């Protein structure tokens, strides 16, 4: 494996330790973060995107964006980055659309093709060849059905607008034995009971 990215949610706290471990293992470290993007229509339902640092300038810009979100724009404890902040400080950053959790994915999930096209063209205009449409496959059967429908639509838009696709997997733990511990953590964060069979199950072993 020539390179590896670490993308925690809304922080770069693991960057130094990750850098040292990666270098010691002969692996190129890539810094980045999953970030909350403010939803103009509803502050309670932010979008999620993935930002990766291309160079030192990108790392500096991502650090500043995260700090600004924590200091100026928290909603229910979630630090949210405004879209125009990213557009003003995009140098050195690569952006992935967030699959079904991003604004484009949500629009496609609602079958709002024209609005999704308009949104992706806006990001392409700013980031040019540093913008990627993201696809994922994980979660329970119901979620996978939505993913498959999304993938079919996003492949069409990617080809139509000459935007590259990238497949990612939201890896949360290294060993399958850690699955139950991670589920417990997820339940605590979301206010669900581990024994509740009706609760959302967003991850698998």
Predicted regions and their residues:
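Phosphodiester-processing cores and adjacent nucleic acid-binding clamps
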Residues: 1-205
């Amino acid at each position: 494996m020539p390179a590896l990215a670490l993308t925690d949610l809304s922080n770069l706290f693991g960057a130094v330790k990750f850098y040292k471990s990666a270098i010691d293992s002969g692996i190129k470290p890539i810094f980045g973060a999953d970030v909350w993007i403010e939803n103009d229509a509803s502050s309670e339902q932010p979008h999620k995107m993935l930002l990766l640092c291309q160079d030192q300038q990108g790392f500096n810009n991502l650090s500043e964006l995260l700090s600004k979100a924590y200091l100026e724009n928290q909603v229910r404890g979630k630090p949210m980055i405004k879209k125009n902040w990213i557009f003003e400080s995009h140098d050195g950053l690569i952006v992935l659309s967030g699959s079904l959790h991003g604004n484009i994915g949500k629009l496609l999930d609602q079958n709002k093709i024209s609005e999704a096209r308009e949104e992706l063209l806006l990001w392409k205009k700013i980031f040019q060849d540093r913008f990627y449409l993201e696809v994922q496959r994980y979660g329970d059967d119901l979620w996978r059905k939505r993913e498959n429908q999304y993938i079919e639509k996003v492949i069409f838009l990617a080809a139509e607008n000459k935007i590259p696709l990238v497949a990612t997997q939201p890896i949360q733990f290294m060993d399958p034995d850690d699955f139950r511990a991670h589920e417990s953590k997820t339940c605590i964060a979301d206010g669900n009971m581990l024994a509740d069979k009706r609760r959302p199950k967003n991850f698998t072993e």
